[in-house]
């Protein structure tokens, strides 16, 4: 968040900057603008939900920058950049994205790779799973219902579920409240 005030991110010469530098600048600006909705307009009730503010800002920054410049292929980079979070998430010492926060150290621990990177990736997966229009309608509903108030993660899942035939809360709880990857059980009764 403090990057947005660094001189090199605000005073850039487009002719001398690399694509990586320009992408980083656009990402940071869009990330901070996304906080106007997730973090400012709607704020989480407690620190355990702060991941949603940061993950949503990470996800929306990529979405906005991809629209701004398709040549930068932000969704390809998004997948590559998130791989480190999934590596950390495969360790036995990993934690869930959302966990009970009872101390200042717990709150500080929320600002890590899993919050930003895995959280952003999980939101992208949800958007692809329920459909872009349904996801956007759910986000709009959530922001309208909870503007200038405090929410919990489940409030977002419930809003998206209103526009989808998928049990969003049930699906997302396995990704958010369990460490690591959720187990998927496949049963092929068709024998094909």
Question: Model segments located where?
Answer:
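Hydrophobic alpha-helical and helix-loop surface patches within well-folded domains
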Residues: 2-192
């Amino acid at each position: 968040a403090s990057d947005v005030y660094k001189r090199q991110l605000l005073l850039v010469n487009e002719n001398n900057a690399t694509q990586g530098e320009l992408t980083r600048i656009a990402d940071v600006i869009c990330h901070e603008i996304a906080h106007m909705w997730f973090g400012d307009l709607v704020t989480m009730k407690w620190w355990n939900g702060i991941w949603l503010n940061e993950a949503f800002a990470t996800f929306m920054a990529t979405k906005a920058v991809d629209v701004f410049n398709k040549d930068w292929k932000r969704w390809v980079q998004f997948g590559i950049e998130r791989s480190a979070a999934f590596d950390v998430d495969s360790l036995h010492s990993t934690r869930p994205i959302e966990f009970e926060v009872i101390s200042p150290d717990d709150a500080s621990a929320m600002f890590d790779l899993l919050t930003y990177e895995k959280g952003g990736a999980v939101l992208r997966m949800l958007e692809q799973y329920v459909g872009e229009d349904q996801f956007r309608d759910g986000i709009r509903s959530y922001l309208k219902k909870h503007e200038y108030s405090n929410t919990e993660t489940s409030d977002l899942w419930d809003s998206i579920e209103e526009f989808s035939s998928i049990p969003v809360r049930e699906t997302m709880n396995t990704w958010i409240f369990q460490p690591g990857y959720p187990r998927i059980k496949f049963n092929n009764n068709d024998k094909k």
